[in-house]
Amino acid sequence: MISTTSTRSQMEATPYEVAQAALIKWGAFMLSIYVIYLLVFPLTPTIYREDHVLEIEQMLRHGRKEFAKFYVLGLFGLFYAYWRVLRTVHSLSREDPEAAKSLRVWVLGVGILCAITLIGLYPITALDVVLYVVRARLWALYDASPMLAWPANYPQDPYIRFAGEYIKEPSPYGPLWELIAQIPIRLGILDIAGGVIAMKVITLISYIAMAVLIGWYARQETSRYRVSGLTAMTFFALNPLVLIQAIGNGHNDMVMLALITLGLVLWQRDRWAAAAFAITLAALIKISGLILMPLFGVAMLAAAPDWRTRILRGLGMASIFIFTAAAAYRVTGPFPEVFLGAQHALFDRWGYTPAYATLVVAEEIFQYEGAVKEVIANAAHLLFILYYVYLLIRVAQRKLTLIQAGFFAYLSQLLLGTTFRIWYPLWLIPFAALELNSRTYWRTFLFSITAELSILMYLIVWRWKLDTWDWGLNGPLKPYWHYWTVMTLTTAPWVFGIPLLGPLLLKWKNSRKFNTSLWL
């Protein structure tokens, strides 16, 4: 009798109830993994135990190596649960669009619960958030602009030791971020753990704002894929890369991306001046936000009905950008010195990209000398510029929308840049969420997985296995068995190859389905 009743209730469940139950089940699964991560890697007291910041490998090497397996399995579990939820909500959106709207609050609630849990997580795979606090203290306590000052110049500060390898570098971030970051310090949050939590709260607020913008206010650029606000918001809000990197590691990219999303939503509503202001603010958080500005300018001019309107809007946008940027940078220091940190970050850092892999092959294997580094860097930059000009032309011709061109621009920056960090694929998400199709979904999804797992390769796999592997040390690859050579030539193909080739294989398998729907 009980079995019959249960079967009947399942048969009578509405699509909304089925989707809600799946969300609760998989949401609880995701939350449980984040809670376990929190228990193993708590922010406090971990941050007080050492005189420097710790990487995940350093936290596991003594007596806890077995947990590395669980960490990896946990990541796969998180991405699997995320994929299951995304499929469920997309199915509901197609079957009952009105009911799907009611599930947005539930999805956002699950995301916020996971995010709040991760506020207490030690930043295990990226330590930038600790640097935010150190640099904010320079300004708030010592009246030294982090855009100019080195942490090394203030040895009296008890937390300067956390600056690590960046102790003799000015801030690479924009002035707006440095203005925001010092607010918690000026409010009296002087402890290092409290400062880290405050920075994560800032990213949490940005995360919620971006989720609301995507779920309630944005619209899809192309209607034929039948993607709802619920699906788009789920794509963003439950992505493990977003939650771990933006909240768990507290990256200020989240603030930049929320402002970019605001700018795109305003653009969709023909509020070009407000959109220009929001995108300018995004570029003043991180210089990478600047990539969108020329595309926005061309899209705005192309959409204007006549030349008089184009001239007026062009002058208006230029005024908004120039005066806002000049005012923000002027507060942080004199020109051009305030740009030194960003310049160093853009042009002097290398690592784990196709360009850097090319450099490693040239220098380590073929023993090229001289200006090979400059040649490769210039070639990569030139390729990006040429492709970017192509995108500008396509936008001017109205063959690409701003959102489509933005996705391609940031994707090309990931591929052609000279440096890569595991949270950089976050840059794709605002554009993918507002133009969600098989191509943008799979590129972003696969990039999220390969990036999140890549740090384990060059921290754990190398240090625990490959560094002491007898075949590598004494075999035919002995002359090349060095950290940068081995890790770059294994990590770069993994991180970039899978997101590039994966969608092509799906398209080859079923081109019609790939091109006409969101194939999950």
Predicted feature locations:
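Short helix- or helix-capping micro-motifs
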Residues: 111, 232-237, 279, 283
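Short hydrophobic alpha-helices at membrane interfaces in multi-pass membrane enzymes
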Residues: 226, 230, 261, 266-281, ...
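Loop-to-helix entry region of an early transmembrane alpha helix in multi-pass inner-membrane enzymes
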Residues: 67-72, 175, 179, 189-209, ...
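Transmembrane-helix signature of polytopic, membrane-embedded enzymes
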Residues: 101-107, 214-239
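Specific aromatic-rich, kink-prone transmembrane helix
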Residues: 209-213, 244, 255-271, 410
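Intramembrane catalytic core of multi-pass membrane enzymes that act on lipidic substrates
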Residues: 99-200, 204
